[in-house]
Amino acid sequence: MNTLNDSLTAFDPDIAALIDGELRRQESGLEMIASENYAPLAVMQAQGSVLTNKYAEGYPGRRYYGGCEFVDGVEQLAIDRVKALFGAEYANVQPHSGATANAATMHALLNPGDTILGLSLAHGGHLTHGMRINFSGKLYHATAYEVSKEDYLVDMDAVAEAARTHRPKMIIAGWSAYPRQLDFARFRAIADEVDAVLMVDMAHFAGLVAAGVHPSPVPHAHVVTSTTHKTLGGPRGGIILCNDPAIAKKINSAVFPGQQGGPLEHVIAAKATAFKMAAQPEFAQRQQRCLDGARILAGRLTQPDVAERGIAVLTGGTDVHLVLVDLRDAELDGQQAEDRLAAVDITVNRNAVPFDPRPPMITSGLRIGTPALAARGFSHNDFRAVADLIAAALTATNDDQLGPLRAQVQRLAARYPLYPELHRT
């Protein structure tokens, strides 16, 4: 029997049912994990296209396979669009993820054993910025800068001192859990002082940069890496940007053949579509609502009824799409708070806070993000309602209070249907 044209529902109802269940879960609750977003239907259609069938090792116009005339057009569109979106001279759109984009950049510009300097994972950095068990900590001599114990901000004087002490070949500016903007110009000045390459990992805030509501690192960094989902709202994947032709040549070689073989042209098509969407006025409006929503949430969680329960907002607020909730003085730990919000259909993730006394699987914090709700169309009033629901859930004194909150969450979510074209009957 030829199954080539069988539908998923007909051939594999088990997987189809699980996908449908996930769709209902995403639609009926509030997705507030800061690294998650909703990919537009057009992006998912591009990713689910016949381009998944095509091998295309190499780059547009320089492939090792025949029949690449259409995938060449797809990849060139993605390159041109992302360069225009971020004002970069060169772009590589082939990395399968942000982690592989970072790995390829290091492979291109460093030798094994070279020193790198990045934000400590425990203070908001990322695995690929030098964690010991990650490739970045195994292949390179990883050193770290931290946030200040007084205000939990990156102390640029301390970064400069660490750079002078360790003399890194690469300085990494970027984060996975830090609620403020970074001073890219100062990072570049420090990098120049010690003759280091500055790599900015803007995976979390790329969408804000594209919309013009966050400073761009592109004019300052030697290299900028990013994911294409998160605030950018595209498919899961990575990109690398730069303005130096010599660096661009090294990066292209490091991606292919250095790190990867055949590019995922169906994902690159989805990236191209996402880049086009990110250039639209509606996208800029969405990113502003994303920022405003995070600030509304931070403001609500600093009110007396929350603060008196030992719950605090790290740094007192946010400049980006996420809020870090500090539970070190609260009755709840991070795991308990995550579970409490899950009980009312609000999905967040527990997250370590700087100087966290609890183990990483428990933590003393929450990371709460607004990109997915902004993508669904949530207004300022909606974000105020969400902030009230989160505050009520975190300060609830018994489980009986959670049922009515869950009903309110479901009513709010129902006002914004998700992917109606995908619902199965």
Curated annotation (Swiss-Prot):
One term under GO cellular component: cytosol
Enzyme Commission no: 2.1.2.1
Pathway: One-carbon metabolism; tetrahydrofolate interconversion; Amino-acid biosynthesis; glycine biosynthesis; glycine from L-serine: step 1/1
InterPro entries reported in the protein's UniProt record: PyrdxlP-dep_Trfase, PyrdxlP-dep_Trfase_major, PyrdxlP-dep_Trfase_small, Ser_HO-MeTrfase, Ser_HO-MeTrfase-like, Ser_HO-MeTrfase_PLP_BS, SHMT-like_dom
MF GO annotations: glycine hydroxymethyltransferase activity; protein homodimerization activity; pyridoxal phosphate binding
Binding positions ((6S)-5,6,7,8-tetrahydrofolate): L121, G125, H126, L127
Top-level taxon in the UniProt lineage: Bacteria
Cofactor binding comment, as recorded: Binds 1 pyridoxal phosphate per subunit.
A Pfam short name: SHMT
Keyword Transferase appears in the UniProt entry: yes
GO biological process annotation, one example: L-serine metabolic process
Plays an important role in substrate specificity, annotated site positions: H229
Broad enzyme group: transferase
Activity vs pH: Optimum pH is about 7.8. Is completely inactive at pH below 4.0 and above 10.0.
Keywords carried by this UniProt record: Amino-acid biosynthesis, Cytoplasm, One-carbon metabolism, Pyridoxal phosphate, Transferase
CDD domains: SHMT (cd00378)
Main location: cytoplasm
Catalysed reaction equations from the record: (6R)-5,10-methylene-5,6,7,8-tetrahydrofolate + glycine + H2O = (6S)-5,6,7,8-tetrahydrofolate + L-serine
Cofactor(s) the record lists: pyridoxal 5'-phosphate
PROSITE patterns, per the entry: SHMT
Subcellular location: Cytoplasm
Subunit structure: Homodimer.
Family of this protein: Belongs to the SHMT family.
Annotated function: Catalyzes the reversible interconversion of serine and glycine with tetrahydrofolate (THF) serving as the one-carbon carrier. This reaction serves as the major source of one-carbon groups required for the biosynthesis of purines, thymidylate, methionine, and other important biomolecules. Also exhibits THF-independent aldolase activity toward beta-hydroxyamino acids, producing glycine and aldehydes, via a retro-aldol mechanism. Thus, is able to catalyze the cleavage of L-allo-threonine.
Protein name: Serine hydroxymethyltransferase 2
Natural source organism: Mycobacterium tuberculosis (strain ATCC 25618 / H37Rv)
Lineage of origin: Bacteria, Bacillati, Actinomycetota, Actinomycetes, Mycobacteriales
Primary gene name: glyA2
